[in-house]
């Protein structure tokens, strides 16, 4: 999801780039003594520990928004927060491979009861935390119960009634209702030590994962080193230094040769940097717009002490929502806004095994106009459709600090003008966008490695059902998906929730969203560094790229 903590991509002119580059170069140089490059052979952070050979370390520039405010605490949001990734410092029960198939990490085996309400995991008996204490099933139960009970936790374990250790190596997870998407959550929830967890854990984490946190200079960098007591294969990359920089500063650091990998966006994709190549990693980092399906002025949505207006008198008309989906030129949007670095998006999980092929739509502006005109809409002298005195005029809100969303909003407005729908883009801070989330159009960013997003966006009581869609048939499919005995068996039900041949959220159905593009995650990568094959990256341009950093190598 993309909300207040969303990492923004700054609009930078070429003139601004020169000034920003100078500042960024100074910042990068300031860190050079602390983080050496893999091919330059410079000394790595002396204060972080013993010297590490240059062929076994990397320095990565990430956006400033990727520095975890609460530290490296899975019971808050490390690994399992808004932008999911593997926690590196901590172990997880299971993990996923590049094809999103589950693999054991701490788990030796697991099974679900016949009623799908109890998951039983047997874990390894040879795992130790970095302080030398053994990791047992009690630590697993403690972690899950802590997350379930904490108001700070971002991982959703509300379906868990209780986790119970029945022995040192067996833990039972009791559910309030069947929820087989639990495995996707467990794949990013790091296990913390019951004996050492408390205030300050995020700054001084004790874990059992591939890496140890050796140094954290807040606002600047974090250094990880390989865990010598790790139970799995020893990491090939023994030291990982992550420096936090704005995008223009990251490019300056690349030009100065101070980092080995650096995030960037389509804004800078046409740059050429000697000694580096631009890598584009596919993602499910989608951009799309929610379209309220109900008339304005309906029941308000209450969240805490806030009450949000709902409904929209233009998008409440299904022919408008369907016409918008038909008229969008996704290819042009990707070329104009992303410089070609993206793929067309039709749903929240394109490319995932649970995605429905029926979500795809072929552009047809003529058919879109016919839909509107058959429903009684007629173009006025201004070229905008109107009916019963109401013009097809919409305001589209986007995060003012995000140049890509701004450009995408403007492109969408231009395309809708061709159709005959007036769209006025309006940038605002996230706190000013939220009041419109159930009644207006917002340019959202979504996408995770879990089908749970489909549930939250489409279920009648889903926490992110901004469109206000409510359909008992769709709800039943979603409930059935979660109640299946294994993940693979759930795929057809996720797909039917989107379109079963007669109804669903698909463009030919309720058309609750219009999706534009899955944004490629772009990185400058130093020549000679082989970044291991990436699985589809979720929303959030940052930590997911280092999910498999332990298997990177220098050629």
Residue ranges and their predicted role:
Residues 97, 101, 178, 184-235, ...:
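Gly/Pro-rich hinge or "lid" segments in bacterial periplasmic/extracellular proteins
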Residues 111, 118, 122, 153-196:
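Surface-exposed binding/hinge segments that line
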Residues 61-114, 206:
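N-terminal lobe/hinge region of extracytoplasmic solute-binding protein
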Residues 2-3, 19-31, 217, 289, ...:
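Detector for C-terminal structural segments
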Residues 378-448:
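Ligand/substrate-recognition segments at binding pockets and active sites
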Residues 228-273, 285, 413, 422-424:
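Ligand-site clamp/hinge motif
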Residues 108-151, 172, 253, 313-314:
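Aromatic- and charge-enriched surface segment that lines or borders ligand/interaction sites
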Residues 59, 136-143, 168-170, 174, ...:
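Alpha-helical secondary-structure segments
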């Amino acid at each position: 999801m993309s909300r207040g903590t969303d990492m923004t991509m700054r609009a930078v002119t070429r003139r601004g780039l020169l000034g920003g580059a100078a500042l960024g170069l100074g910042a990068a140089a300031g860190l050079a003594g602390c983080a050496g490059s893999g091919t330059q052979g410079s000394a790595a952070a002396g204060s972080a520990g013993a010297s590490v050979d240059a062929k076994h370390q990397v320095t990565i520039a990430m956006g400033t928004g990727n520095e975890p405010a609460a530290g490296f605490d899975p019971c808050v949001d490390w690994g399992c927060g808004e932008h999911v990734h593997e926690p590196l410092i901590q172990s997880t029960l299971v993990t996923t491979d590049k094809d999103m198939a589950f693999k054991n990490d701490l788990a030796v085996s697991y099974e679900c009861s016949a009623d799908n309400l109890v998951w039983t995991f047997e874990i390894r008996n040879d795992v130790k935390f970095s302080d030398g204490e053994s990791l047992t099933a009690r630590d697993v139960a403690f972690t899950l119960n802590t997350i379930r009970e904490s108001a700070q936790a971002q991982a959703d374990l509300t379906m868990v009634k209780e986790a119970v250790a029945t022995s040192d190596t067996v833990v039972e997870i009791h559910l309030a209702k069947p929820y087989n998407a639990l495995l996707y959550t467990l794949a990013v929830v790091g296990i913390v030590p019951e004996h050492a967890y408390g205030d300050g854990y995020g700054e001084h984490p004790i874990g059992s994962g591939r890496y140890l946190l050796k140094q954290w200079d807040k606002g600047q960098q974090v250094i990880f080193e390989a865990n010598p007591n790790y139970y799995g294969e020893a990491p090939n990359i023994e030291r990982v230094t992550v420096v936090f920089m704005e995008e223009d500063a990251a490019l300056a650091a690349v030009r100065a040769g101070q980092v080995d990998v650096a995030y960037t966006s389509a804004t800078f994709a046409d740059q050429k940097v000697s000694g580096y190549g631009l890598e584009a990693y596919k993602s499910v980092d989608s951009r799309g717009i929610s379209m309220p399906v109900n008339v304005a002025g309906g029941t308000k949505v209450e969240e805490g002490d806030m009450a949000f207006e709902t409904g929209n008198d233009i998008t409440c008309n299904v022919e408008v929502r369907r016409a918008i989906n038909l008229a969008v030129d996704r290819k042009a949007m990707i070329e104009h806004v992303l410089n070609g670095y993206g793929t067309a998006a039709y749903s929240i999980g394109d490319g995932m095994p649970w995605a429905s092929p029926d979500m795809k739509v072929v552009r047809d502006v003529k058919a879109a106009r016919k839909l509107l005109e058959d429903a009684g809409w007629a173009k006025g002298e201004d070229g905008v459709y109107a009916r019963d005195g109401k013009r097809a005029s919409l305001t589209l809100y986007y995060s003012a600090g995000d140049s890509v969303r701004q450009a995408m909003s403007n492109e969408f407005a231009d395309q809708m003008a061709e159709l005959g729908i007036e769209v006025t883009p309006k940038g605002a801070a996230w706190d000013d966008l939220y009041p419109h989330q159930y009644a207006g159009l917002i340019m959202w960013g979504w996408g995770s490695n879990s089908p749970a997003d489909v549930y939250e966006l489409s279920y009648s009581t889903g926490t992110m059902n901004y469109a206000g869609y409510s359909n008992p048939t769709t709800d039943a499919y979603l409930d059935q998906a979660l109640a299946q005995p294994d993940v693979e068996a759930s795929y057809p039900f996720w797909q039917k929730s989107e379109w079963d041949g007669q109804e669903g959220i698909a463009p030919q159905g309720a058309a609750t969203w219009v999706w534009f593009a899955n944004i490629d995650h772009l990185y400058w990568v130093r020549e000679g560094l082989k970044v291991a094959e990436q699985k589809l990256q979720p929303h959030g341009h940052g930590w997911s790229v280092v999910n498999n950093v332990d298997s990177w190598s220098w050629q």
